[in-house]
Amino acid sequence: MDFWFILGVILKMAFILGVALLLYAPVFVLFERRQSAMFQDRLGPYMGGVKMPRAVIDNIPALQMGGYASAAGAAVTAGLALVMIARGGAEDPGLWLLPISWGTLFLLAAVGAPAQFVGAKVLPYLFHHDRLTLFGGLHAVFDAVKAFTKEDIIPPKADKFLYAIAPIIAMIPAFALGAVLPFGPDLHLEWLFDTLPAEGIIEGPVAHLQVASLNVGILYMFAIGGTGVISAAIAGYSSDNKFALLGGLRAASQMVSYEVTLGLSLVGCFMLYDTLRLEEMVRWQSENSFLGFLPAWGIFYQPLAFVLFFFASIAEYKRVPFDAPEGESEIVAGSFLEYSTGKWLMWMIGEFLEVAISSMLIAIIFFGGWDVPGLSRSGWEAFGYHFDLGGTNWEFLSTFANAHLTVTLVSIGAFLLKALLLGILSLQVRWTLPRFRYDQIMQLCWKLFLPLSLLNVFVTGILILLFQ
């Protein structure tokens, strides 16, 4: 292995984990706390913040009005540039001796106007009274700092070794699963600022935006994800607490049961895509169409599989309404009842990492991954027409919009946005459905989800044979 390969692996793994830990996890925590505050009619995550000088707080209205004025000025500039282009004026406006065209000026102003308006609109919400709270996002940061600085209490009769490693084991599957998730198309390093050809093989160095491309990619995810049951069982056993033991037993049986549905619900997708590689699944969805005009995303071909996999994944990471293993009204807190401070926070981090990884996997299999309708590797196109504006006024816009680096960044952003929305949807279920009893959870798995999964496999196989 050479230096650049190792560096690439480290950077790609850091990107996946960084997005999950530093973007998704805080957003999920903030969303969940805001939802709970709304339902319980309380303040919410706004107590944690940085105290700001009085002069800054008093000048927020003035800053907001300045933002509105700046947005209005940018909008007027965009309109002026558009009028000059329409009237066929000089292509070089000669503003401050800057070598830019009217088209470039229009692009900058058209992007800047709404950005400044939104910035002015949200400015007051960054503060709560005299504190900078960033929409309540700093509250979670302060909670994490507090958790790792408080005393770690260990039950006197607990198995100290198993008690200590259980939360670590809970985090390992989430870290390992990120290695096979493709988060973008291949990056051709010699074509970053050029437009890729629509067809053919492209020579030159390529950076695959995936740590490991395995021919058993999805099976690897099931194999590694299934080891999470070990941590719950160990935590329940080692805590020397009967409620924790009951929670561990519940978690183990529930996770093992729903893994069956998780696997069977995706068999139809394997048959459709004819591959187990996650990146090939995305390519199949991006290269085909559904009914001739819709993207060939898995949710259109396998809607039942999506519903089954979505709810089975919620049961797998034990979120409401499938949180019987940690039901507060029955067994207090389940397998991690005796955990506190940093170790308890590790359980929470592992749980939200599972939500993030599961959302990314659903986005890849059912929502085209990084695929964006109307965007191909050669740039923006629709109904056979390629986005290419003539004239030097629009040269910068056309070149920038179709550049390989722009296409790649938009694709990565689309994938991350899909996963984020799916994660928020799974958290929304918590505040929509009541908790099921443990027996109801098991009956739902074996009497409804499993038969429907088998039916989906049977119907998919017949349809593929008929239309192949």
Stretches found by the model and what they are:
Residues 1-468:
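Selective transmembrane helix interface/packing segments
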